[in-house]
A protein has these predicted regions:
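N-terminal signal-anchor transmembrane helix specifying type II single-pass membrane topology
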Residues: 1-19
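N-terminal targeting/anchoring "stem" of glycan-biosynthesis enzymes
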Residues: 15, 294-297, 301-401
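N-proximal low-complexity "stem/linker" segments adjacent to membrane-targeting elements
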Residues: 22-78
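Short, acidic, metal-binding catalytic loop of nucleotide-sugar glycosyltransferases
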Residues: 86-94
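Active-site-proximal specificity loops/subdomain of glycosyltransferases
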Residues: 103-151
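Short beta-strand-to-loop acidic/aromatic patch adjacent to the donor-nucleotide binding site
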Residues: 145, 152-161
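Conserved donor-nucleotide/metal-binding helix-loop-beta segment in metal-dependent transferases, i.e.
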Residues: 162-203
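Catalytic core and acceptor-binding pocket of nucleotide-sugar-dependent glycosyltransferases
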Residues: 203-324, 369-372, 392-395, 400
C-alpha cells in the first residue's frame, strides 16, 4: 500500500480555513478571544462577578432589548471561550455567560468574558445526558428565560456547545408575532428556502439547546417553570417543554399569523415556530447530512447534538469544521505536523450492488490501515498527525433515521 505523505510546516495561528464548502468571506476571524484588549471597557477582571439581575441584563441588552445568553461549568469553560469569540467576531456586545461554579466564575472573569454567577449546587464535572445532574440544570436555565422575558427582553439562549455564527435577531424579527422560535431534532428539512420549517417538520422534538423567546411567551414559560420546579432532579426540561408547548395546541390553525409556518402553541395562547434545521443546525444536520453546506448558506448556529464521546467528541467535530478556537500554540507543535492524502477507492465507496455491512467494514478498514501507518510515521518523526476525513458507508446512530 502506497501512502502519499506531506511533511507540513507548522500552521500559523491565523490559518483558519473555511468550514467545508464555504468561502473565506463566510468565516469570521475569531482569534480575538486571546486579545487582552477585548475587555469592552467593563473592567470585568477587577470587579466582583454579579448575579443575574434586571440591571445587568437590561444594560447588556441595550436599547434594542435583545440578549444572548449561555452558561457553563468549570470543565466546559473552553466551550465558553469559543462561544464568546464567535459572537465578538460579529461585533456584538449584548451577551452574557452564566457560571455555575466558582472555578468557572474565576476563569471567565480572568478571560474577560462578560459573565454572572448562577450560584448553583450542581456537580462541577460532566453532566451526562439523562442523569440527575443533567436534569437539575433545567430549572436554572428556565429561570434565566423567565426573568429575561419578565424584564421585557427578547432572548436567545443556547447551550454552551451551540455556537452563534450569525446575528440571530434580524432573522427573529421576520416573525414579530412569534412568542418562541425553537431549533429541532428533525433530520430532514421540509423547505428549500431560508424560512421556518413548515408544519410537516414541527412534530419532531423541539431542541431547547438554542431557542428564542419574547415576552409574549410568558404563559408558556410560567407553566414550564412551575412544573419543572415541582421535581427538578427528575423532570427533564426539554421533554416537558415539548409536552407543554403542544398542550391543546392547534398546529393547523394559521389565521391571524404573520407567516403560515407559525403555529398556535400551549392552549392557543402562544405563537411558536421551528427554525430551519439547515441554518440553525444540529450536529447530524451539519456534520453528517451537511444541509447548510449543500444549500451554500452559512448557518446561524451549529449545535453539537447527535455526537459521540461527550465533550471530547464535540470539540473534535467543531475543530473539524474549523469553528473551534484553540490557542495559537495548538497550531505550532514543537516537532511540526504530518498530513497525508488518503487513498479511498471509488469501488469501496460505491460498490456495484450497493453498500452493505461488510462493505462498510471493508471501507473503514482500508482507511484505518492508512491511519495506523501514518501514526507510526508521525511518532517516528516526532510530528503531530492531522487526521484525514474518513469516508463511511453507513452512519453510526442510536436513533431512528
Amino acid at each position: 500500500m502506497l501512502l502519499a505523505v506531506l511533511l507540513a510546516p507548522a500552521l500559523q495561528p491565523d490559518a483558519f480555513a473555511a468550514p467545508l464548502d464555504y468561502t473565506e468571506a463566510d468565516v469570521r476571524d475569531v482569534r480575538g478571544i486571546y486579545d487582552d484588549s477585548l475587555d469592552g471597557g467593563r473592567g470585568l477582571a477587577e470587579s466582583a462577578t454579579p448575579p443575574f439581575s434586571s440591571e445587568l441584563a437590561i444594560k447588556v441588552a441595550g436599547p434594542k432589548k435583545q440578549l444572548l445568553l449561555s452558561f457553563t461549568n468549570r470543565i466546559r469553560v473552553d466551550f465558553a471561550f469559543t462561544w464568546v469569540a464567535h459572537i465578538r467576531a460579529l461585533g456584538l456586545t449584548n451577551f452574557l455567560v452564566g457560571a455555575t461554579d466558582d472555578v468557572a466564575v474565576e476563569e471567565l472573569t480572568t478571560g474577560k468574558v462578560p459573565c454572572f454567577s448562577m450560584k448553583t449546587n450542581l456537580p462541577q464535572g460532566e453532566w451526562p445526558w439523562g442523569s440527575s445532574s443533567f436534569k437539575a440544570l433545567g430549572p436554572h436555565k428556565i429561570e434565566l428565560i423567565y426573568k429575561s422575558i419578565q424584564w421585557g427582553l427578547e432572548v436567545v439562549i443556547t447551550d454552551i456547545d451551540a455556537l452563534v455564527l450569525r446575528d440571530p435577531f434580524p432573522y427573529m424579527a421576520r416573525y414579530p408575532d412569534a412568542g418562541f422560535l425553537t431549533t429541532s431534532d428533525h433530520l430532514g428539512n421540509t423547505t428549500a428556502d431560508d424560512g421556518l420549517e413548515d408544519h410537516r417538520g414541527i412534530h419532531s422534538a423541539f431542541n431547547i439547546g438554542y431557542m428564542f423567546f419574547r415576552p409574549s411567551a410568558i404563559p408558556l414559560v410560567e407553566e414550564w417553570r412551575r412544573y419543572i420546579n415541582e421535581d427538578p432532579r427528575n423532570r427533564w426540561d426539554q421533554g416537558e417543554f415539548n409536552r407543554i408547548a403542544r398542550s391543546k395546541w392547534k398546529p393547523g390553525r394559521t389565521d391571524g399569523l404573520s407567516d403560515k409556518r407559525l403555529f398556535w402553541a400551549y392552549q392557543e395562547k402562544v405563537i411558536g415556530g421551528v427554525l430551519p434545521i439547515a441554518l440553525f443546525a444540529g450536529g447530524h444536520n451539519y456534520f453528517v447530512s451537511q444541509l447548510a453546506q449543500r444549500m451554500g448558506v452559512p448557518p446561524y448556529s451549529i449545535h453539537t447534538t447527535f455526537q459521540y464521546s461527550a465533550a471530547a467528541g464535540k470539540r473534535h467535530r467543531l475543530r473539524e469544521a474549523m469553528v473551534w478556537i484553540d490557542e495559537p500554540s495548538y497550531y505550532d507543535p514543537p516537532g511540526g505536523l504530518l498530513v497525508y492524502a488518503p487513498d479511498v477507492p471509488k469501488a469501496l465507496v460505491y460498490p456495484p450492488k450497493g453498500m452493505t455491512t461488510n462493505g462498510h467494514i471493508a471501507l473503514i478498514k482500508h482507511q484505518l490501515r492508512q491511519i495506523r501507518s501514518a501514526l507510526a510515521l508521525a511518532q517516528a518523526l516526532g510530528r503531530k498527525l492531522i487526521l484525514p476525513e474518513v469516508t463511511c458507508g453507513y452512519d453510526k446512530a442510536w436513533f431512528q433515521l
